[in-house]
UniProtKB/Swiss-Prot annotation:
TPR repeats: 205-238
Cleaved signal peptide residues: 1-17
Binding site for Fe cation: 429, 431, 500
Subcellular location: Endoplasmic reticulum lumen
SS bonds (residue pairs): none
Catalytic reaction(s) noted: L-prolyl-[collagen] + 2-oxoglutarate + O2 = trans-4-hydroxy-L-prolyl-[collagen] + succinate + CO2
Name this polypeptide is given: Prolyl 4-hydroxylase subunit alpha-1
Family statement drawn from the similarity comment of this UniProt entry: Belongs to the P4HA family.
Leading EC class: oxidoreductase
Glycosites: 113, 259
Keyword flag Signal: yes
Species this chain originates from: Bos taurus (Bovine)
Cross-referenced PROSITE patterns: FE2OG_OXY, TPR, TPR_REGION
PANTHER family: PROLYL 4-HYDROXYLASE ALPHA SUBUNIT (PTHR10869), PROLYL 4-HYDROXYLASE SUBUNIT ALPHA-1 (PTHR10869:SF101)
Length: 534
Protein backbone atom coordinates (compact mmCIF):
# COMPACT_ATOMS: atom_id res chain seq x y z
CA UNK A 1 0.00 0.00 0.00
CA UNK A 2 2.84 2.40 0.91
CA UNK A 3 4.56 1.56 -2.40
CA UNK A 4 1.32 2.33 -4.26
CA UNK A 5 1.02 5.73 -2.59
CA UNK A 6 4.66 6.53 -3.40
CA UNK A 7 4.18 5.61 -7.06
CA UNK A 8 1.05 7.73 -7.33
CA UNK A 9 2.85 10.60 -5.60
CA UNK A 10 5.67 10.41 -8.11
CA UNK A 11 3.52 10.00 -11.20
CA UNK A 12 0.66 12.36 -10.47
CA UNK A 13 2.59 15.62 -10.99
CA UNK A 14 3.76 14.36 -14.37
CA UNK A 15 0.17 13.91 -15.50
CA UNK A 16 -0.53 17.53 -14.58
CA UNK A 17 2.68 18.85 -16.05
CA UNK A 18 1.79 19.10 -19.70
CA UNK A 19 -1.48 20.91 -20.39
CA UNK A 20 -0.33 21.88 -23.90
CA UNK A 21 0.62 25.50 -23.25
CA UNK A 22 1.30 26.32 -26.91
CA UNK A 23 -2.40 25.91 -27.76
CA UNK A 24 -3.56 28.78 -25.52
CA UNK A 25 -2.01 32.23 -25.12
CA UNK A 26 -4.19 32.75 -22.05
CA UNK A 27 -2.57 29.84 -20.24
CA UNK A 28 0.90 30.77 -21.48
CA UNK A 29 0.67 34.01 -19.49
CA UNK A 30 0.79 31.88 -16.33
CA UNK A 31 4.28 30.79 -17.38
CA UNK A 32 5.47 34.40 -17.28
CA UNK A 33 4.58 34.59 -13.58
CA UNK A 34 6.19 31.19 -12.98
CA UNK A 35 9.43 32.34 -14.58
CA UNK A 36 9.34 35.63 -12.63
CA UNK A 37 9.02 33.65 -9.38
CA UNK A 38 11.99 31.49 -10.38
CA UNK A 39 14.10 34.56 -11.19
CA UNK A 40 13.34 35.97 -7.73
CA UNK A 41 14.33 32.64 -6.19
CA UNK A 42 17.52 32.59 -8.27
CA UNK A 43 18.46 36.10 -7.12
CA UNK A 44 17.94 35.03 -3.50
CA UNK A 45 20.30 32.12 -4.11
CA UNK A 46 22.91 34.43 -5.68
CA UNK A 47 22.66 36.78 -2.68
CA UNK A 48 23.14 33.86 -0.28
CA UNK A 49 26.20 32.68 -2.24
CA UNK A 50 27.62 36.21 -2.27
CA UNK A 51 27.14 36.53 1.52
CA UNK A 52 28.83 33.17 1.97
CA UNK A 53 31.79 34.21 -0.21
CA UNK A 54 32.04 37.50 1.66
CA UNK A 55 32.40 35.61 4.96
CA UNK A 56 35.07 33.35 3.46
CA UNK A 57 36.87 36.35 1.99
CA UNK A 58 37.00 38.15 5.36
CA UNK A 59 38.29 34.96 7.00
CA UNK A 60 40.99 34.58 4.35
CA UNK A 61 42.10 38.21 4.68
CA UNK A 62 42.36 37.90 8.48
CA UNK A 63 44.39 34.68 8.23
CA UNK A 64 46.59 36.15 5.51
CA UNK A 65 47.61 39.00 7.79
CA UNK A 66 48.08 36.62 10.73
CA UNK A 67 50.19 34.03 8.89
CA UNK A 68 52.31 36.74 7.26
CA UNK A 69 53.30 37.96 10.71
CA UNK A 70 53.75 34.44 12.11
CA UNK A 71 56.02 33.18 9.32
CA UNK A 72 58.51 36.00 9.88
CA UNK A 73 59.36 34.61 13.35
CA UNK A 74 57.61 31.27 13.88
CA UNK A 75 59.34 30.42 17.16
CA UNK A 76 58.78 33.84 18.63
CA UNK A 77 55.15 33.81 17.51
CA UNK A 78 54.20 30.47 19.07
CA UNK A 79 56.34 31.31 22.08
CA UNK A 80 53.55 33.62 23.11
CA UNK A 81 51.04 31.44 25.02
CA UNK A 82 48.02 33.29 23.64
CA UNK A 83 49.22 32.80 20.05
CA UNK A 84 49.87 29.12 20.77
CA UNK A 85 46.35 28.70 22.20
CA UNK A 86 44.72 30.51 19.29
CA UNK A 87 46.71 28.46 16.75
CA UNK A 88 45.46 25.24 18.35
CA UNK A 89 41.92 26.62 18.45
CA UNK A 90 41.98 27.77 14.82
CA UNK A 91 43.29 24.51 13.42
CA UNK A 92 41.14 22.31 15.64
CA UNK A 93 37.86 24.23 15.58
CA UNK A 94 37.72 27.27 13.33
CA UNK A 95 39.05 25.59 10.21
CA UNK A 96 36.36 22.92 10.67
CA UNK A 97 33.75 25.67 10.86
CA UNK A 98 35.17 27.21 7.70
CA UNK A 99 35.05 23.81 6.02
CA UNK A 100 31.36 23.49 6.95
CA UNK A 101 30.70 26.97 5.59
CA UNK A 102 32.43 26.16 2.29
CA UNK A 103 30.55 22.88 2.00
CA UNK A 104 27.20 24.44 2.92
CA UNK A 105 24.81 24.18 -0.03
CA UNK A 106 23.09 27.54 -0.43
CA UNK A 107 21.06 26.27 -3.39
CA UNK A 108 18.55 24.22 -1.38
CA UNK A 109 15.81 26.87 -1.47
CA UNK A 110 16.23 27.55 -5.17
CA UNK A 111 16.40 23.86 -6.12
CA UNK A 112 13.33 23.12 -4.00
CA UNK A 113 11.34 25.89 -5.71
CA UNK A 114 12.58 24.84 -9.14
CA UNK A 115 11.55 21.23 -8.48
CA UNK A 116 8.04 22.33 -7.50
CA UNK A 117 7.65 24.63 -10.52
CA UNK A 118 9.18 22.19 -12.99
CA UNK A 119 6.07 19.99 -12.95
CA UNK A 120 4.19 22.90 -14.56
CA UNK A 121 6.84 23.59 -17.22
CA UNK A 122 6.13 23.16 -20.95
CA UNK A 123 7.41 19.94 -22.49
CA UNK A 124 8.87 18.96 -25.85
CA UNK A 125 5.41 18.98 -27.43
CA UNK A 126 4.97 22.62 -26.43
CA UNK A 127 8.38 23.64 -27.76
CA UNK A 128 7.84 21.84 -31.06
CA UNK A 129 4.29 23.20 -31.27
CA UNK A 130 5.52 26.77 -30.83
CA UNK A 131 8.23 26.18 -33.46
CA UNK A 132 5.69 24.81 -35.95
CA UNK A 133 3.51 27.84 -35.24
CA UNK A 134 6.34 30.15 -36.32
CA UNK A 135 6.73 28.17 -39.55
CA UNK A 136 2.97 28.35 -40.12
CA UNK A 137 2.93 32.11 -39.58
CA UNK A 138 5.89 32.45 -41.91
CA UNK A 139 3.93 30.82 -44.74
CA UNK A 140 0.52 32.34 -44.07
CA UNK A 141 1.74 35.92 -43.82
CA UNK A 142 4.62 35.71 -46.34
CA UNK A 143 7.28 36.54 -43.76
CA UNK A 144 10.95 36.01 -44.52
CA UNK A 145 13.27 34.49 -41.94
CA UNK A 146 15.19 37.74 -41.43
CA UNK A 147 11.99 39.62 -40.56
CA UNK A 148 11.02 37.01 -37.98
CA UNK A 149 14.56 36.78 -36.61
CA UNK A 150 14.68 40.55 -36.06
CA UNK A 151 11.20 40.55 -34.52
CA UNK A 152 9.86 43.03 -37.07
CA UNK A 153 6.23 41.90 -36.79
CA UNK A 154 3.27 44.29 -37.16
CA UNK A 155 1.86 45.72 -33.96
CA UNK A 156 4.49 44.25 -31.62
CA UNK A 157 5.11 46.01 -28.30
CA UNK A 158 7.94 43.81 -27.11
CA UNK A 159 10.51 43.24 -29.84
CA UNK A 160 12.40 39.98 -29.56
CA UNK A 161 15.30 38.59 -31.58
CA UNK A 162 16.16 35.04 -32.61
CA UNK A 163 19.70 33.85 -31.95
CA UNK A 164 21.67 31.44 -34.12
CA UNK A 165 20.66 28.69 -31.67
CA UNK A 166 16.98 29.64 -32.11
CA UNK A 167 17.19 29.58 -35.92
CA UNK A 168 19.07 26.29 -35.80
CA UNK A 169 16.37 24.81 -33.55
CA UNK A 170 13.60 25.90 -35.93
CA UNK A 171 15.48 24.31 -38.80
CA UNK A 172 15.86 21.06 -36.85
CA UNK A 173 12.14 20.96 -36.04
CA UNK A 174 11.36 21.34 -39.75
CA UNK A 175 13.97 18.68 -40.56
CA UNK A 176 12.37 16.22 -38.13
CA UNK A 177 9.05 16.76 -39.93
CA UNK A 178 10.78 16.13 -43.30
CA UNK A 179 9.95 19.75 -44.14
CA UNK A 180 13.15 20.43 -46.05
CA UNK A 181 11.84 23.70 -47.50
CA UNK A 182 11.74 25.37 -44.08
CA UNK A 183 14.88 23.51 -42.99
CA UNK A 184 16.78 25.25 -45.77
CA UNK A 185 15.33 28.68 -44.96
CA UNK A 186 16.18 28.55 -41.26
CA UNK A 187 19.60 26.93 -41.64
CA UNK A 188 20.49 29.65 -44.15
CA UNK A 189 19.34 32.26 -41.63
CA UNK A 190 21.52 30.67 -38.94
CA UNK A 191 24.47 30.64 -41.34
CA UNK A 192 23.87 34.28 -42.27
CA UNK A 193 23.92 35.35 -38.62
CA UNK A 194 27.11 33.37 -38.02
CA UNK A 195 28.73 35.05 -41.04
CA UNK A 196 27.72 38.43 -39.57
CA UNK A 197 29.80 37.62 -36.50
CA UNK A 198 27.21 36.48 -33.98
CA UNK A 199 28.82 34.40 -31.22
CA UNK A 200 27.11 31.04 -30.83
CA UNK A 201 27.51 27.56 -29.42
CA UNK A 202 26.30 26.27 -32.79
CA UNK A 203 29.09 26.04 -35.36
CA UNK A 204 28.97 26.40 -39.13
CA UNK A 205 29.77 22.72 -39.64
CA UNK A 206 26.55 21.64 -37.90
CA UNK A 207 24.48 24.17 -39.84
CA UNK A 208 26.01 23.20 -43.20
CA UNK A 209 25.45 19.52 -42.42
CA UNK A 210 21.67 20.03 -42.15
CA UNK A 211 21.55 22.64 -44.90
CA UNK A 212 23.32 20.57 -47.55
CA UNK A 213 21.05 17.57 -46.94
CA UNK A 214 17.88 19.71 -46.99
CA UNK A 215 18.94 21.24 -50.31
CA UNK A 216 19.71 17.78 -51.71
CA UNK A 217 16.27 16.50 -50.66
CA UNK A 218 14.71 19.31 -52.68
CA UNK A 219 16.61 18.29 -55.78
CA UNK A 220 19.28 21.01 -56.04
CA UNK A 221 22.37 18.79 -56.40
CA UNK A 222 24.67 21.61 -57.52
CA UNK A 223 23.99 23.65 -54.39
CA UNK A 224 24.15 20.56 -52.16
CA UNK A 225 27.59 19.73 -53.59
CA UNK A 226 28.79 23.31 -53.11
CA UNK A 227 27.64 23.38 -49.47
CA UNK A 228 29.23 20.00 -48.76
CA UNK A 229 32.57 21.21 -50.11
CA UNK A 230 32.26 24.32 -47.93
CA UNK A 231 31.66 22.08 -44.92
CA UNK A 232 34.73 19.98 -45.71
CA UNK A 233 36.88 23.11 -45.91
CA UNK A 234 35.98 23.68 -42.25
CA UNK A 235 36.19 20.04 -41.19
CA UNK A 236 38.06 17.83 -43.72
CA UNK A 237 37.56 14.72 -41.56
CA UNK A 238 33.76 14.97 -41.37
CA UNK A 239 32.68 11.41 -42.19
CA UNK A 240 29.10 12.07 -43.34
CA UNK A 241 30.14 15.02 -45.51
CA UNK A 242 32.88 12.95 -47.17
CA UNK A 243 30.37 10.20 -47.87
CA UNK A 244 27.82 12.68 -49.21
CA UNK A 245 30.43 14.31 -51.44
CA UNK A 246 31.21 11.01 -53.14
CA UNK A 247 27.50 10.19 -53.47
CA UNK A 248 26.58 13.60 -54.93
CA UNK A 249 29.45 13.41 -57.44
CA UNK A 250 28.36 9.90 -58.40
CA UNK A 251 24.74 11.00 -58.95
CA UNK A 252 25.80 14.02 -61.01
CA UNK A 253 28.11 11.92 -63.17
CA UNK A 254 25.33 9.40 -63.69
CA UNK A 255 22.90 12.14 -64.73
CA UNK A 256 25.47 13.63 -67.07
CA UNK A 257 25.86 10.28 -68.84
CA UNK A 258 22.10 9.85 -69.01
CA UNK A 259 21.65 13.33 -70.47
CA UNK A 260 24.09 12.56 -73.24
CA UNK A 261 22.14 9.49 -74.30
CA UNK A 262 18.65 10.97 -74.23
CA UNK A 263 17.33 14.52 -74.35
CA UNK A 264 13.95 13.21 -73.18
CA UNK A 265 15.58 11.78 -70.08
CA UNK A 266 17.17 15.18 -69.48
CA UNK A 267 13.84 17.02 -69.43
CA UNK A 268 12.29 14.33 -67.24
CA UNK A 269 15.22 14.52 -64.84
CA UNK A 270 14.92 18.29 -64.49
CA UNK A 271 11.26 17.91 -63.64
CA UNK A 272 12.06 15.27 -61.06
CA UNK A 273 14.82 17.22 -59.36
CA UNK A 274 13.28 20.66 -59.08
CA UNK A 275 10.73 20.31 -56.31
CA UNK A 276 11.67 23.29 -54.18
CA UNK A 277 8.90 25.44 -52.80
CA UNK A 278 5.48 24.76 -51.35
CA UNK A 279 4.52 21.49 -49.75
CA UNK A 280 2.91 18.70 -51.76
CA UNK A 281 -0.44 19.17 -49.99
CA UNK A 282 -0.55 22.89 -50.86
CA UNK A 283 -4.05 22.95 -52.38
CA UNK A 284 -5.72 25.90 -54.16
CA UNK A 285 -8.06 26.36 -51.17
CA UNK A 286 -5.03 26.74 -48.95
CA UNK A 287 -3.71 29.50 -51.20
CA UNK A 288 -7.05 31.34 -51.09
CA UNK A 289 -7.22 30.88 -47.33
CA UNK A 290 -3.76 32.38 -46.80
CA UNK A 291 -4.46 35.28 -49.16
CA UNK A 292 -7.62 36.11 -47.21
CA UNK A 293 -5.70 35.92 -43.94
CA UNK A 294 -3.29 38.53 -45.33
CA UNK A 295 -6.17 40.77 -46.40
CA UNK A 296 -5.55 40.04 -50.08
CA UNK A 297 -8.96 38.51 -50.72
CA UNK A 298 -11.50 39.02 -53.46
CA UNK A 299 -12.81 42.56 -53.48
CA UNK A 300 -16.57 42.86 -53.69
CA UNK A 301 -17.83 44.83 -56.69
CA UNK A 302 -19.24 48.33 -56.02
CA UNK A 303 -22.64 47.09 -57.16
CA UNK A 304 -22.67 44.38 -54.50
CA UNK A 305 -21.22 46.71 -51.87
CA UNK A 306 -24.13 49.11 -52.36
CA UNK A 307 -26.45 46.37 -51.13
CA UNK A 308 -24.65 46.11 -47.79
CA UNK A 309 -26.09 48.32 -45.06
CA UNK A 310 -25.72 49.31 -41.43
CA UNK A 311 -28.93 49.47 -39.42
CA UNK A 312 -30.49 49.44 -35.98
CA UNK A 313 -32.06 46.06 -35.26
CA UNK A 314 -34.79 45.62 -32.65
CA UNK A 315 -35.13 41.83 -32.93
CA UNK A 316 -38.49 42.07 -34.73
CA UNK A 317 -39.96 44.46 -32.17
CA UNK A 318 -38.50 42.62 -29.21
CA UNK A 319 -39.30 44.68 -26.06
CA UNK A 320 -35.66 44.46 -24.92
CA UNK A 321 -34.41 46.23 -28.04
CA UNK A 322 -37.15 48.70 -28.94
CA UNK A 323 -35.65 51.56 -26.91
CA UNK A 324 -32.02 50.46 -27.37
CA UNK A 325 -31.78 48.60 -30.68
CA UNK A 326 -28.65 46.65 -31.58
CA UNK A 327 -26.22 48.06 -34.14
CA UNK A 328 -26.10 45.71 -37.12
CA UNK A 329 -23.76 45.73 -40.12
CA UNK A 330 -23.79 43.59 -43.27
CA UNK A 331 -20.33 42.04 -43.71
CA UNK A 332 -21.19 39.89 -46.76
CA UNK A 333 -24.18 39.16 -48.96
CA UNK A 334 -23.93 35.49 -50.00
CA UNK A 335 -23.77 33.84 -47.57
CA UNK A 336 -25.25 36.63 -45.51
CA UNK A 337 -22.84 37.44 -42.70
CA UNK A 338 -24.03 40.00 -40.16
CA UNK A 339 -21.95 41.75 -37.51
CA UNK A 340 -23.51 43.10 -34.32
CA UNK A 341 -21.56 45.96 -32.72
CA UNK A 342 -21.23 46.61 -28.96
CA UNK A 343 -23.23 43.48 -28.30
CA UNK A 344 -21.25 42.15 -25.33
CA UNK A 345 -19.73 44.36 -22.62
CA UNK A 346 -16.18 44.23 -21.27
CA UNK A 347 -17.56 43.18 -17.87
CA UNK A 348 -19.47 40.27 -19.43
CA UNK A 349 -16.38 39.25 -21.39
CA UNK A 350 -14.29 39.10 -18.22
CA UNK A 351 -16.90 36.95 -16.46
CA UNK A 352 -17.00 34.52 -19.39
CA UNK A 353 -13.19 34.35 -19.54
CA UNK A 354 -12.88 33.83 -15.77
CA UNK A 355 -15.40 30.99 -15.92
CA UNK A 356 -13.65 29.39 -18.89
CA UNK A 357 -9.98 29.66 -17.89
CA UNK A 358 -9.91 26.81 -15.32
CA UNK A 359 -11.66 24.49 -17.80
CA UNK A 360 -9.70 25.21 -20.95
CA UNK A 361 -8.77 22.00 -22.75
CA UNK A 362 -7.24 21.33 -26.16
CA UNK A 363 -9.96 21.92 -28.76
CA UNK A 364 -11.16 18.86 -30.64
CA UNK A 365 -13.06 18.05 -33.83
CA UNK A 366 -15.59 15.32 -34.53
CA UNK A 367 -14.08 12.56 -36.67
CA UNK A 368 -16.40 12.34 -39.73
CA UNK A 369 -15.96 8.56 -39.90
CA UNK A 370 -16.03 7.45 -36.26
CA UNK A 371 -17.83 10.41 -34.71
CA UNK A 372 -15.22 10.47 -31.93
CA UNK A 373 -13.74 13.73 -30.65
CA UNK A 374 -10.02 14.08 -31.36
CA UNK A 375 -7.28 16.71 -31.43
CA UNK A 376 -5.83 17.67 -34.81
CA UNK A 377 -2.84 19.70 -35.99
CA UNK A 378 -5.02 22.16 -37.90
CA UNK A 379 -6.95 23.33 -34.84
CA UNK A 380 -4.62 25.10 -32.42
CA UNK A 381 -6.68 26.42 -29.54
CA UNK A 382 -8.17 25.51 -26.19
CA UNK A 383 -11.86 25.60 -25.42
CA UNK A 384 -14.32 25.31 -22.57
CA UNK A 385 -18.10 24.91 -22.45
CA UNK A 386 -20.36 27.10 -20.31
CA UNK A 387 -23.98 26.34 -19.42
CA UNK A 388 -26.57 29.05 -18.96
CA UNK A 389 -27.74 27.69 -15.60
CA UNK A 390 -24.33 28.08 -13.92
CA UNK A 391 -24.06 31.86 -14.19
CA UNK A 392 -26.61 34.63 -14.88
CA UNK A 393 -24.21 36.35 -17.30
CA UNK A 394 -24.04 33.26 -19.53
CA UNK A 395 -27.83 32.90 -19.34
CA UNK A 396 -28.26 36.56 -20.29
CA UNK A 397 -25.91 36.17 -23.26
CA UNK A 398 -27.84 33.12 -24.48
CA UNK A 399 -31.15 34.99 -24.31
CA UNK A 400 -29.61 37.94 -26.16
CA UNK A 401 -28.70 35.60 -29.03
CA UNK A 402 -32.25 34.24 -29.08
CA UNK A 403 -33.81 37.72 -29.04
CA UNK A 404 -31.66 39.03 -31.89
CA UNK A 405 -31.75 35.97 -34.16
CA UNK A 406 -35.31 34.89 -33.48
CA UNK A 407 -34.05 31.32 -33.06
CA UNK A 408 -34.71 29.06 -30.09
CA UNK A 409 -31.54 28.55 -28.02
CA UNK A 410 -33.00 25.80 -25.83
CA UNK A 411 -31.78 23.20 -28.36
CA UNK A 412 -28.47 24.96 -29.00
CA UNK A 413 -25.12 23.70 -27.77
CA UNK A 414 -23.56 25.26 -24.69
CA UNK A 415 -21.55 28.44 -25.13
CA UNK A 416 -18.09 27.42 -26.31
CA UNK A 417 -15.23 29.70 -25.25
CA UNK A 418 -11.95 29.43 -27.14
CA UNK A 419 -8.52 30.92 -26.61
CA UNK A 420 -6.03 30.54 -29.45
CA UNK A 421 -2.38 29.61 -28.93
CA UNK A 422 0.88 30.52 -30.66
CA UNK A 423 -0.08 30.89 -34.31
CA UNK A 424 -3.52 29.66 -33.21
CA UNK A 425 -5.83 28.72 -36.04
CA UNK A 426 -8.65 26.48 -37.23
CA UNK A 427 -8.22 25.60 -40.90
CA UNK A 428 -11.17 25.57 -43.39
CA UNK A 429 -14.12 23.53 -42.15
CA UNK A 430 -17.91 23.38 -42.06
CA UNK A 431 -19.87 23.91 -38.87
CA UNK A 432 -22.74 21.75 -40.13
CA UNK A 433 -22.73 18.00 -40.68
CA UNK A 434 -22.83 16.94 -44.31
CA UNK A 435 -24.89 14.07 -45.71
CA UNK A 436 -21.97 11.66 -45.42
CA UNK A 437 -21.79 12.46 -41.67
CA UNK A 438 -25.26 11.36 -40.49
CA UNK A 439 -24.10 10.51 -36.97
CA UNK A 440 -22.25 13.76 -36.26
CA UNK A 441 -24.89 15.21 -33.89
CA UNK A 442 -27.01 12.09 -33.40
CA UNK A 443 -26.39 11.95 -29.65
CA UNK A 444 -27.71 15.50 -29.20
CA UNK A 445 -31.01 14.65 -30.88
CA UNK A 446 -31.45 18.26 -32.00
CA UNK A 447 -30.71 17.98 -35.70
CA UNK A 448 -28.00 19.77 -37.64
CA UNK A 449 -26.32 23.08 -36.81
CA UNK A 450 -28.60 25.59 -38.46
CA UNK A 451 -26.61 28.71 -37.59
CA UNK A 452 -23.44 30.04 -35.94
CA UNK A 453 -23.12 33.02 -33.59
CA UNK A 454 -19.53 34.10 -32.89
CA UNK A 455 -18.50 36.66 -30.24
CA UNK A 456 -15.12 38.40 -30.52
CA UNK A 457 -13.92 38.88 -26.94
CA UNK A 458 -10.58 40.53 -27.69
CA UNK A 459 -8.88 42.70 -30.25
CA UNK A 460 -6.02 41.02 -32.12
CA UNK A 461 -2.94 43.07 -33.00
CA UNK A 462 -2.27 41.15 -36.24
CA UNK A 463 -3.93 38.18 -37.91
CA UNK A 464 -6.76 36.11 -36.47
CA UNK A 465 -9.43 36.90 -39.09
CA UNK A 466 -12.41 34.65 -39.78
CA UNK A 467 -12.33 33.92 -43.52
CA UNK A 468 -14.63 32.20 -46.01
CA UNK A 469 -12.43 30.87 -48.86
CA UNK A 470 -15.35 29.79 -51.06
CA UNK A 471 -16.62 33.36 -51.43
CA UNK A 472 -13.58 35.47 -50.50
CA UNK A 473 -14.95 37.07 -47.34
CA UNK A 474 -12.72 38.17 -44.44
CA UNK A 475 -14.15 39.21 -41.07
CA UNK A 476 -11.65 40.81 -38.69
CA UNK A 477 -11.83 40.49 -34.89
CA UNK A 478 -13.18 43.48 -33.00
CA UNK A 479 -13.74 43.23 -29.27
CA UNK A 480 -17.38 43.49 -28.20
CA UNK A 481 -18.81 42.52 -31.59
CA UNK A 482 -20.37 39.30 -32.86
CA UNK A 483 -20.99 37.80 -36.28
CA UNK A 484 -23.90 35.57 -37.29
CA UNK A 485 -24.62 33.39 -40.30
CA UNK A 486 -26.84 30.49 -41.30
CA UNK A 487 -25.08 27.20 -42.05
CA UNK A 488 -28.18 25.65 -43.59
CA UNK A 489 -30.65 26.90 -46.15
CA UNK A 490 -34.25 27.11 -44.94
CA UNK A 491 -34.79 23.76 -46.68
CA UNK A 492 -32.30 22.13 -44.32
CA UNK A 493 -29.67 21.65 -47.02
CA UNK A 494 -26.13 22.66 -46.12
CA UNK A 495 -24.80 25.94 -47.49
CA UNK A 496 -21.32 25.01 -48.71
CA UNK A 497 -20.36 28.65 -49.15
CA UNK A 498 -20.17 28.90 -45.33
CA UNK A 499 -16.94 26.87 -45.26
CA UNK A 500 -14.73 29.05 -43.09
CA UNK A 501 -11.51 29.19 -41.10
CA UNK A 502 -9.85 31.03 -38.23
CA UNK A 503 -6.58 32.52 -39.48
CA UNK A 504 -3.41 32.10 -37.41
CA UNK A 505 -2.90 34.76 -34.75
CA UNK A 506 0.27 36.57 -35.80
CA UNK A 507 0.57 38.95 -32.84
CA UNK A 508 -1.71 39.19 -29.82
CA UNK A 509 -4.22 37.13 -27.89
CA UNK A 510 -7.49 35.95 -29.42
CA UNK A 511 -10.53 35.10 -27.31
CA UNK A 512 -13.83 34.12 -28.92
CA UNK A 513 -17.02 32.39 -27.85
CA UNK A 514 -19.58 30.81 -30.11
CA UNK A 515 -23.07 29.40 -29.99
CA UNK A 516 -24.15 26.71 -32.42
CA UNK A 517 -27.93 26.74 -32.88
CA UNK A 518 -29.64 23.54 -34.03
CA UNK A 519 -32.63 22.72 -36.23
CA UNK A 520 -35.01 21.44 -33.54
CA UNK A 521 -37.25 24.18 -32.21
CA UNK A 522 -36.89 26.34 -35.31
CA UNK A 523 -39.72 24.74 -37.33
CA UNK A 524 -41.98 27.79 -36.96
CA UNK A 525 -39.23 30.34 -36.37
CA UNK A 526 -37.55 29.61 -39.70
CA UNK A 527 -40.02 27.58 -41.78
CA UNK A 528 -38.91 25.50 -44.75
CA UNK A 529 -39.23 27.06 -48.22
CA UNK A 530 -40.17 25.41 -51.50
CA UNK A 531 -36.70 25.84 -52.97
CA UNK A 532 -33.87 23.52 -51.90
CA UNK A 533 -31.24 26.25 -52.00
CA UNK A 534 -33.09 29.08 -50.26
Amino acid sequence: MIWYILVVGILLPQSLAHPGFFTSIGQMTDLIHTEKDLVTSLKDYIKAEEDKLEQIKKWAEKLDRLTSTATKDPEGFVGHPVNAFKLMKRLNTEWSELENLVLKDMSDGFISNLTIQRQYFPNDEDQVGAAKALLRLQDTYNLDTDTISKGDLPGVKHKSFLTVEDCFELGKVAYTEADYYHTELWMEQALRQLDEGEVSTVDKVSVLDYLSYAVYQQGDLDKALLLTKKLLELDPEHQRANGNLKYFEYIMAKEKDANKSSSDDQSDQKTTLKKKGAAVDYLPERQKYEMLCRGEGIKMTPRRQKKLFCRYHDGNRNPKFILAPAKQEDEWDKPRIIRFHDIISDAEIEVVKDLAKPRLRRATISNPITGDLETVHYRISKSAWLSGYENPVVSRINMRIQDLTGLDVSTAEELQVANYGVGGQYEPHFDFARKDEPDAFKELGTGNRIATWLFYMSDVLAGGATVFPEVGASVWPKKGTAVFWYNLFASGEGDYSTRHAACPVLVGNKWVSNKWLHERGQEFRRPCTLSELE
